[in-house]
C-alpha cells in the first residue's frame, strides 16, 4: 500500500495498516523537502503506484488529490484501512479509500462512502448513509438513519440525532448537537446546532 500525504494523519493510517498486517511501501508527497515519514521513504511521484490511500485529513483537499491521481493513473486502485479494534457490522458497506480508526463503531446496514475518515472512537449507527469524502471526527456520534451528503465534517465530539440530514460540504462544529436537518455549504455550531 502507498500513502499519499506524509503527515500526522498519514502516520496514524500507516500504524492502522501495520496493525492489520499490511505493509506500507512508501509515502508520496508534493513537498520536495520531506524525504521520510514514520520510518518510510517519501517519494514525490505517484505514477503507476497502486494500491493507494490518500492520507490527508482535509475533505476538499483529499477530493482534489483523488481526482488528480485518477487523471494521472486511470487504473489506480484505492485500498481500505480498518483498525483491528474497530467494530464493523458484517452488513455495513465501506467504500474504497476509506479509513476506520481505532475504537470506531459502524453498525448494521450503515453505508460509508468513498475516501471517508471514521476517526478514533467515532460511531456510525444503523442505516446511516455517509457520503464520499466525509470525516466523522474523533468521538463524534451519528444516531440511526442519519444521512451525510458529500464532504461533511462532523467535528470532534459532535452528534446527530436519528434521521437528520446534513447537506454537502457542511461543517458541524466540535461538540455541536444536530437536532434538525442542516443545509449544505454552511458551518453549524452549538446546542442545538445552528448555521453561523
For every predicted segment, state its role.
Residues 71-125:
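Hydrophobic, well-structured mid-protein blocks that either form specific transmembrane helices
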Residues 1-45, 76:
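Hydrophobic, well-ordered beta-alpha structural blocks that scaffold small-molecule cofactor pockets
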Residues 52-55, 100, 189:
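Redox-cofactor binding/interface segments in oxidoreductases and associated redox assembly factors
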Amino acid at each position: 500500500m502507498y500513502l499519499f500525504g506524509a503527515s500526522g494523519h498519514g502516520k496514524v493510517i500507516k500504524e492502522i495498516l501495520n496493525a492489520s498486517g499490511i505493509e506500507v511501501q512508501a509515502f508520496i508527497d508534493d513537498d520536495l523537502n520531506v524525504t521520510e515519514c514514520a520510518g518510510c521513504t517519501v517519494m514525490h511521484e505517484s505514477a503507476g503506484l497502486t494500491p493507494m490511500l490518500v492520507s490527508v485529513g482535509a475533505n476538499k483537499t483529499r477530493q482534489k488529490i483523488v481526482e488528480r491521481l485518477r487523471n494521472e493513473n486511470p487504473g489506480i486502485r484505492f485500498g481500505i484501512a480498518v483498525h483491528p479494534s474497530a467494530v464493523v457490522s458484517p452488513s455495513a458497506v465501506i467504500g474504497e479509500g476509506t479509513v476506520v480508526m481505532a475504537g470506531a463503531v459502524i453498525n448494521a446496514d450503515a453505508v460509508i462512502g468513498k475516501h471517508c475518515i471514521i476517526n478514533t472512537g467515532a460511531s456510525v449507527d444503523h442505516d446511516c448513509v455517509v457520503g464520499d469524502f466525509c470525516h466523522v471526527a474523533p468521538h463524534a456520534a451519528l444516531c440511526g438513519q442519519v444521512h451525510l451528503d458529500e464532504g461533511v465534517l462532523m467535528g470532534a465530539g459532535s452528534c446527530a440525532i436519528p434521521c437528520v440530514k446534513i447537506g454537502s460540504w457542511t461543517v458541524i462544529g466540535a461538540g455541536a448537537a444536530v437536532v434538525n436537518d442542516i443545509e449544505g455549504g454552511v458551518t453549524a455550531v452549538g446546542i442545538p446546532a445552528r448555521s453561523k
